[in-house]
């Protein structure tokens, strides 16, 4: 291992620029030494491999073998590195200050580091126990200064290392040889430029290291199995003030008072303790802590709380996305894979479903075939053979002519119409011939019947035309035929009277339809009642229009003077209807003798 460290420090490029096989051999030598150290030492975990195989393997395969070894012993190695950090740094600083370029000093330092590492491995178990005891004994306030002390010690070590570098750079300047390249002048010095760049890099590394010091990469990783300490309200806020208890005059048992105080204290603590880092989704669980307060609610308030929960649940279900089967027509890309297997689909089958072939079906078919062969029952359809191949098909073939028609479309329609009329005329002639044939046959049958039985066959009824003259009813009263009904001798209103029903329970409407009162609807009854009222009101209404006209005439005449109204009898009256007396004296005409 020390040889590998020496080669890496002296000339690391020699290893990197080697062949892959040579590099793998160097890695094999280092990892084999680590495995032997783990076997000989008192490490709790042992390596899974005894040695690393390099022959015939590439770098990736060799790396995975190394990873298996390091993963099995990484815990002890990291613990050893953390313990040796303070030991290796001062020794390294001293060696750099004394002899930086001497390989013997480096080898001695590495050997010392290895020996110290082995001793630390031997005492790893004891150190872990001591650390656990110290961690348990220390409080949270004591842990913070320890972290600060570690930071300050690390910063001091880095500053010392930087000073030693400056000293070594000064010594290098004293023993520096003249410019080998010949590029130095009074304005530019190559050695000074290199020193400045190294100093700038060191300052950058120091600043980055100070930022990385906040994170301790060698501390123990927190395990998930360890229970996290609960954070309560008391850790951040003061305890609530207790109300002074009033002293009652009645003397009570001190034990009962203590029990009551404990119960009150427990209930108050349950109310105060809250999980400050709980999510919003855990709010119902946080409310469960205060279930004791629900006991103080009335039955109506509890019922309202349950109703609100149900309403909230229903609203969430209504707003939530519906299932694909409730969205109507869904294509295959819009539904999950194999979703139809769990659904019961209803659709119309256009064809007869194919029967499922089972062992029972096949056995029954085989038995039926054997039985029919034994019985020679071959009732299959006979195969049809066409003997006359030259026979033409019954359907006439349509031939479309390529010659342009000489007739117009109107002429073609006209020919079709006349052809249909000719066919109808032919059918009428054929019908006349059929009627003549049937008449001749009927005469023949009658003659044959007469010859067979003259006494029992009546004469055939001959069709005769009867002409009736519609004469008035008065002229037919004297000579009325006996076979005619009395309806022809009645007046039309006697036969059919609109609005008058034949029975008491019927009503005849204006259109002549007779309906029973029970068949009338409420609207029909109301309509008939309103019509009857209008009819009665018209009958009882006096002749207002005529009187109004007469009054208008009288009013116009009354405005004039010396108006006399003479009626049909020759009486003279004034406009108001009073008889008008003559004011003249006695005359020869009106003197009584």
Swiss-Prot record:
The modification N-acetylserine is found at residue 2. One of its GO terms (molecular function) is identical protein binding. The keyword Transferase does not apply. InterPro entries: Mpp10. The modification Phosphoserine is found at residues 176-177. Residues 90-297, 564-593 are annotated as: Disordered. GO terms for cellular component: 90S preribosome; Mpp10 complex; nucleolus; nucleoplasm; nucleus; small-subunit processome; sno(s)RNA-containing ribonucleoprotein complex. Coiled coil: none annotated. Residues 128-147, 202-232, 256-265 have a biased composition (Acidic residues). It is found in: Nucleus, Nucleolus. It comes from the Eukaryota. The modification Phosphotyrosine is found at residue 181. Keywords: Acetylation, Nucleus, Phosphoprotein, Ribonucleoprotein, Ribosome biogenesis, rRNA processing. It holds the Pfam family Mpp10. Residues 148-177, 186-195, 236-255, 266-276 have a biased composition (Basic and acidic residues). GO terms for biological process: endonucleolytic cleavage in 5'-ETS of tricistronic rRNA transcript (SSU-rRNA, 5.8S rRNA, LSU-rRNA); endonucleolytic cleavage in ITS1 to separate SSU-rRNA from 5.8S rRNA and LSU-rRNA from tricistronic rRNA transcript (SSU-rRNA, 5.8S rRNA, LSU-rRNA); endonucleolytic cleavage to generate mature 5'-end of SSU-rRNA from (SSU-rRNA, 5.8S rRNA, LSU-rRNA); maturation of SSU-rRNA. Its main location: nucleus. Involved in nucleolar processing of pre-18S ribosomal RNA. Required for the early cleavages at sites A0, A1 and A2 during 18S ribosomal pre-RNA processing. Component of a heterotrimeric complex containing IMP3, IMP4 and MPP10. Interacts with snoRNA U3. Component of the ribosomal small subunit (SSU) processome composed of at least 40 protein subunits and snoRNA U3. Interacts with the SSU processome subunits EMG1, IMP3, IMP4, KRR1, NOC4/UTP19, NOP1, RPS4A, RPS4B, RPS6A, RPS6B, RPS7A, RPS7B, RPS9A, RPS9B, RPS14A, RPS14B, UTP1-UTP18, UTP20-UTP22 and UTP25. Belongs to the MPP10 family. This is U3 small nucleolar RNA-associated protein MPP10. It comes from Saccharomyces cerevisiae (strain ATCC 204508 / S288c) (Baker's yeast). The lineage of its organism: Eukaryota, Fungi, Dikarya, Ascomycota, Saccharomycotina. The gene is MPP10.
């Amino acid at each position: 291992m020390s040889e590998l460290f020496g080669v890496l420090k002296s000339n690391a490029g020699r290893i990197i620029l080697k062949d892959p096989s040579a590099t793998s051999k160097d890695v094999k030598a280092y990892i084999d030494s680590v495995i032997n150290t783990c076997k000989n030492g008192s490490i709790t975990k042992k390596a899974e491999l005894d040695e690393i195989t390099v022959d015939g393997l590439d770098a990736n395969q060799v790396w995975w073998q190394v990873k298996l070894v390091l993963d099995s012993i990484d815990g002890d190695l990291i613990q050893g590195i953390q313990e040796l950090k303070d030991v290796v740094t001062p020794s390294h600083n001293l060696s750099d200050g004394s002899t930086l370029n001497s390989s013997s000093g480096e080898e001695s330092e590495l050997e010392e580091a290895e020996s110290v590492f082995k001793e630390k491995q031997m005492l790893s178990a004891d150190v872990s126990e001591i650390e656990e005891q110290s961690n348990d004994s220390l409080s949270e306030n004591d842990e913070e200064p320890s972290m600060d002390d570690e930071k300050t010690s690390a910063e001091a070590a880095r500053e010392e290392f930087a000073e030693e570098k400056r000293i070594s750079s000064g010594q290098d300047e004293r023993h520096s040889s003249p410019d080998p390249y010949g590029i130095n002048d009074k304005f530019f010095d190559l050695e000074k430029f290199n020193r400045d760049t190294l100093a700038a890099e060191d300052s950058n590394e120091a600043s980055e290291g100070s930022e990385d010091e906040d994170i301790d990469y060698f501390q123990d990783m927190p395990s998930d199995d360890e229970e996290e300490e609960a954070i309560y309200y008391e850790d951040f806020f003061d305890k609530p003030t207790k109300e002074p208890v009033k002293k009652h005059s009645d003397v009570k048992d001190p034990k009962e008072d203590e029990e009551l105080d404990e119960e009150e204290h427990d209930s108050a603590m349950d109310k105060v303790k809250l999980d400050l880092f709980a999510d919003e989704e855990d709010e119902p669980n946080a409310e469960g802590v205060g279930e004791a307060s629900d006991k103080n609610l009335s039955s109506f308030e509890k019922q309202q709380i349950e109703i609100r929960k149900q309403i909230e649940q229903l609203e969430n279900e209504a707003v939530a996305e519906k299932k694909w089967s409730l969205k109507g027509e869904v294509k295959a890309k819009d539904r999950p894979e194999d979703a139809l297997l769990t659904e019961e689909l209803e659709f119309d089958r256009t064809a007869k479903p194919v029967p499922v072939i089972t062992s029972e079906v096949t056995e029954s078919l085989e038995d039926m075939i054997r039985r029919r062969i034994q019985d020679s029952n071959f009732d299959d359809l006979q195969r049809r053979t066409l003997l006359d191949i030259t026979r033409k098909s019954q359907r006439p073939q349509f031939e479309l002519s390529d010659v342009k028609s000489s007739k117009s479309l109107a002429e073609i329609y006209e020919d079709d119409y006349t052809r249909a009329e000719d066919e109808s005329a032919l059918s009428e002639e054929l019908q006349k011939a059929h009627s003549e044939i049937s008449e001749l046959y009927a005469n023949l049958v009658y003659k044959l019947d007469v010859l067979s039985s003259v006494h029992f066959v009546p004469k055939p009824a001959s069709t005769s035309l009867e002409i009736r003259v519609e004469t008035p009813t008065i002229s037919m009263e004297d000579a009325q035929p006996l076979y005619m009904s009395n309806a022809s001798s009645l007046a039309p209103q006697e036969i059919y009277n609109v609005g008058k029903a034949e029975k008491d329970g019927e009503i005849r409407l204006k259109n002549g339809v007779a309906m029973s009162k029970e068949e009338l609807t409420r609207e029909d009854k109301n309509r008939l009642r309103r019509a009857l009222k209008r009819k009665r009101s018209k009958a009882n209404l006096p002749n207002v229009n005529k009187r109004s006209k007469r009054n208008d005439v009288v009013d116009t005449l009354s405005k004039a003077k010396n108006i006399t109204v003479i009626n049909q009898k020759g009486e003279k009256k004034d406009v108001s209807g009073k008889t008008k007396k003559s004011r003249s004296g006695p005359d020869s005409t009106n003197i009584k003798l």
